Structures are given as C-alpha cells and as structure tokens.
Amino acid sequence: MIPSDPPNKRPVKFRHGMLAFVLLALVMFCCVVVLGTGPQIPIVIGCTLAGAIALYLRFTWEEVLQSMLKGILDALEAVLILMCIGMMIGTWILSGTVPTLIYYGLYVISPELFLPVAFLGTLLVGIVLGSWGAAGTIGIAFIGIAAALNIPLGMAAGAIIAGAYVSEIASPLTDGPVLCAAIAKVNVFDLCKKFLPLVLIVCAISIALYYALGIMQGANFSNTDSSNIDELLTALSSSYHIGPATLIPLAIMIVCIIVQVPAIPAFLLGVALGVIEAVVLQGADISIALEAANTGVISTTGCEVLDTLFSTGGIEEMLPTICIVILVMAYVGILQHTGLMASLISPITSRLRRLGSLSAATVGTGALFNVLMPDQYPAIALSCKMYGEAFARRNVSGSIWSNIVNSSAGITSVLIPWNTCSIYMVTILGVSCLEYLPYAFFCYLYPAIVVLVAITLGEKLWWKRRV
C-alpha cells in the first residue's frame, strides 16, 4: 500500500526525466514497430513507468493522479474539437461538400499536371478530412490514376502525402493543430492563420517542383487510360448533387476562420450546415443526416474507390484519436507536474540564448521524437510542453511557438519508415517510405524554412519585445 504522507521527496535529477522518456520511447518502439500494436497500450505502460518513477521520488499516489488529471484537463478542449470534426466530416460527405471538391479536382487532371493536381487535391480534401483521411480516400484514387497514366508511384505518393500533410499545419480541422492549440491555450484558427503566409510560400515552391517534374517526365507518361477518371466522375455525378451550392459550408467555415469565430461554435455551425444541405440538396432523411454526425457515413455508390473514400466520419471515427490524446496528456501531466520534464529540458534551454537557436532545437527535437517514439501525438505533446515555457520567457506568443513545434513534430512523422504515420501511408498507398520520401517536398522543406526564417527574421517578426 502506498503511504499517504511519505517523507521528504528526493531531488529530481536529469537522469530521472531521461529515464521516463527513454522508457516510453523503448516501449513505444518495441510495441508499435516490433509487435505491430496500436500506440494506446504502450502509452499506458509509459504512464505506469513514469508514475513509478514519481513514486520512487516520494510523490504520493494522489499527487501522481492529480498530475495526470491536470494533463488531461489541458486536452479537454481538443477532445471536444475532435468530436466536432468527426461530426462535420460525416455531414460534409453526406451533403456533397467533399464529393464536389473531389469532382472538380479530378475534372481538371492531365498527365503533365498530375503531380501538382494530386498535391492540391489531397491538400483540399485534407483541410476537411485530415492527412490520414485525405491520403486514405482521394489518395487511393490518385494512386490508381497514376498507375493508369504510367506515372512513377513514388512521385505520385510523394505528392499525395505532401499535400495531405499541409493540413497538419494549416487546417483547424486536423489533430495536430488542435492538440497544439489546446496545449498552448490559443485559438486553433489563430494558430493556423499565423503561419499561413509561410505555408503558402512552401506550397508554391512544392507546386513548382511538381510541375517541373511533370514536364520533365511528360514524355514518359505513355499508355494513358482516362477510363479510371471517367468512372469516378460518373459515379460522383450519379450519386451526389454536384455544384457550387454544396461548397457553401466550406465557404462559411473560411469566413469563420477569417473573423476568428471560436473553434467549437464554428465547427458546430459547419455540422448544422452539413445536415441542412444533406437534407435539402441530397434528399437525405433527417435521421440519416444526424446519424452521419454520430457514426459516420456508409457509402453505397457501387464504386469501390468512392465507397472506401466516403465510408468515414462521425464521432465514433475519432474515438481512437481521442483515446491517444487523453493518454498522451496523462503521461505529459506526470512529467510536467512532478518536475521530471523540467529536469530534462532545463539543461538544454538554458544554453539557447537566441530565438533562432531555440527554434532550431525545437524543430530538431520534434523530428527526433518522431524517430524515437513512432507516433506524432507524443512528439507534439512533449515538444509543446518541453519548449513552451522557454518561448514564453522570451515573450513569444503561443500561436507562434506552437506552430514552430508543429512544423516538425506534426509533419516529419511520415518521413520515418517505422513511424505509425509512415506505416499507414505505406499500407494504404502500396508505396514504400524510401520511394515517396524524396518527393514529399512540403514535409521537409517546411520545417527547414521555418528554422531559416527563425534564425534570420524570427526576432523581428515573432519576438514581442517588452517595453
């Protein structure tokens, strides 16, 4: 039985914080990579081991429990937002919003323009469905089209994945920005807008590179067969009312972002508009539209690609992600409120005097966490908690430093062959990580340019100097 009033606590040393981190990384790697399990149970084991270290340091069980609860409390807004996102995905598929985006994207495709169109197409769908949703839906369609157009699948997968992962930086509907915003205690819309000019610059560079690749490879795109595209277009137009009216929910969401409507009310408005359009434009029964918000959509278009594409959404679809977020934040809570995290990060941040070096260390740490702990959620949460206070002491706003964290921890995960993000992409697209990695331009250009801007212009642009 754990004593309720232990003697004076032992001093928390660097080795204690490092041990808690190394144990989680080791358990995550063994379970996820070697045994092929999901990340939830390894994180539970990591929480148990971190709690055991805290008990060894003579914290009481009540203190450990309160540490976990405080960590989870930081994530409650993110949990609510993730539920809203699930509801909105389901209703926007049923309303025809997502099908219309895909229809217009496929309509303008050509062999030479395939790579930039694949990048932009998955980017647009990713804004709504998230990176995994976009790659696992329209990404599958683009891979099939690439095969028909005789386009190297490594190039195609790189463009698809890069486009999908733009959403992990720029979309308020995706997990990474939501988690970062919750930990930094900032509005998720403000977070996504803050670095939008930088995102657009890197997207423009990526599109130019894909266009150049398409032109150079154009002569090799032989045996072109447009039947796959025609089949998808026919199935979309016969199953949904396609037209500008179905994009009204998306347009209103963009307005909400511009005028900084709080995240949860904006998402609920998006859900309501999706339900209304599903009933009015698509002729869905109101009960089916509401159930799409709960359990998602089960597509029956008769087209296998589209049925895979649209059988998603709803609160239930988000439950595994919500579980991971809660468990990760419980682990982070133990590290933060028992001093284990401070013991680990203080020796590092104390040596980083300038904003550029601190930003570079943050980006490097996020990438390292994705290597050592093969899942992006621990990488994001730990990076935010480790470096947030160091940025705050330099008077850098939460919407800026959380973007710096997410620029690495949120998107480099897909470049690591044993990370869950890469494993997922390899599984659904059928292309190895080493094949697509050279062509996922955004995923490594963006963090590099963030560091470059931080070193050269960061103190002028991002540092609010105290008067």
What residue ranges belong to the model's regions?
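Generic alpha-helical transmembrane segments of integral inner-membrane proteins
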Residues: V22-L26, C30, T48, A52, ...
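Hydrophobic transmembrane alpha-helices of multi-pass solute/ion transporters
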Residues: I2-M87, L94-E112, A235-S239, A251-L327, ...
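Transmembrane helix-loop junctions in multipass membrane proteins, especially transporters and channels
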Residues: V32-T37, L55-F59, V98, G130-A134, ...
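Hydrophobic alpha-helical transmembrane segments
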Residues: M18-L19, V44, V79-L80, E112-V117, ...
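Juxtamembrane membrane-interface segments at transmembrane alpha-helix termini
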Residues: I53-E62, A146-L153, A170-T174, E277-A289, ...
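Membrane-embedded alpha-helical segments and adjacent helix-loop junctions characteristic
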Residues: F59-A147, G302-G388
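Central hydrophobic cores of alpha-helical transmembrane segments
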Residues: G136-F142, I160-I161, A266-I276, I404-V405
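Membrane-core helix-loop-helix motifs of multi-pass transport proteins
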Residues: P6-R15, I145-H241, V396-V467
